[in-house]
Amino acid sequence: MFAYFKGSLVTALPEEAVIDVSGVAYRMLISATTFRQLPDEGSQVLLYAHLSVREDALQLYGFFKEEERQLFRLLLLTSGVGPKLALAVLSGLQVPEVHEAIMANEPERLYGVSGVGKKTAARIILELRDKILKLPLVTPAAGKAAMPSHHVKDDAVHALVTLGFSRLLAQKAVSALLEEKPEQSVEEVIKYALATIHNS
């Protein structure tokens, strides 16, 4: 029904965003992955949309990238996986990581996500392994090459927190930088993150 919403970002929270489109405010639930990529409040933003229809409610979900929305919809095809759990998966893992876990038959990578048990992780892999090949997602090889190592991100965030910045601000700045330049060292990430924070 809705392809996307484009407008002014009114509110950006870790679990939801509000966008003003021509004077109408739309509340959308988002993943942590999308939250980290959002611009500052008041900026223009485009979020790809998914409308969940239930008997008692209509709920919009927003995604910064189309491939995240595609994977969200694919996860919903799994028995026992609803929008809340699908969003939790996309908050705990990035798109290439989910793709790799499914293709490599590694359920332990999925049940490390809050709310995903061993049986659910096994079902996701069993039911989606063939379906995921039909999506124009990042290939496992390409995804692995582009993914920054976790220690770089963790060390950079820790350093920024030590310098007095909030963990949320540090995580957002570091994640945004590594999204564009995943090959950066810890020192480079800290340097550019500091510049980004001071210029914001």
Curated annotation (Swiss-Prot):
Protein name: Holliday junction branch migration complex subunit RuvA
GO cellular component: cytoplasm; Holliday junction helicase complex; Holliday junction resolvase complex
One Gene Ontology biological process: DNA recombination
Cysteine pairs bridged by disulfides in the record: none
Region of interest called Flexible linker, as start-end residue ranges on this chain: 143-147
Keywords assigned by UniProt, alphabetized: Cytoplasm, DNA damage, DNA recombination, DNA repair, DNA-binding
Comment field on protein domains: Has three domains with a flexible linker between the domains II and III and assumes an 'L' shape. Domain III is highly mobile and contacts RuvB.
InterPro entries: DNA_helicase_Holl-junc_RuvA_I, Hlx-hairpin-Hlx_DNA-bd_motif, NA-bd_OB-fold, RuvA, RuvA_2-like, RuvA_C, RuvA_C_sf
Principal location: cytoplasm
Region named Domain III: 148-200
Family note: Belongs to the RuvA family.
Positions of region (Domain II): 65-143
Transmembrane segments: none
UniProt function note: The RuvA-RuvB-RuvC complex processes Holliday junction (HJ) DNA during genetic recombination and DNA repair, while the RuvA-RuvB complex plays an important role in the rescue of blocked DNA replication forks via replication fork reversal (RFR). RuvA specifically binds to HJ cruciform DNA, conferring on it an open structure. The RuvB hexamer acts as an ATP-dependent pump, pulling dsDNA into and through the RuvAB complex. HJ branch migration allows RuvC to scan DNA until it finds its consensus sequence, where it cleaves and resolves the cruciform DNA.
Subunit-structure text: Homotetramer. Forms an RuvA(8)-RuvB(12)-Holliday junction (HJ) complex. HJ DNA is sandwiched between 2 RuvA tetramers; dsDNA enters through RuvA and exits via RuvB. An RuvB hexamer assembles on each DNA strand where it exits the tetramer. Each RuvB hexamer is contacted by two RuvA subunits (via domain III) on 2 adjacent RuvB subunits; this complex drives branch migration. In the full resolvosome a probable DNA-RuvA(4)-RuvB(12)-RuvC(2) complex forms which resolves the HJ.
Spans annotated as Domain I: 1-64
GO molecular function, one term: ATP binding
Gene3D superfamilies, per database record: 5' to 3' exonuclease, C-terminal subdomain, DNA helicase RuvA subunit, C-terminal domain, Nucleic acid-binding proteins
Organism of origin: Chlorobium phaeobacteroides (strain DSM 266 / SMG 266 / 2430)
Compartments it resides in: Cytoplasm
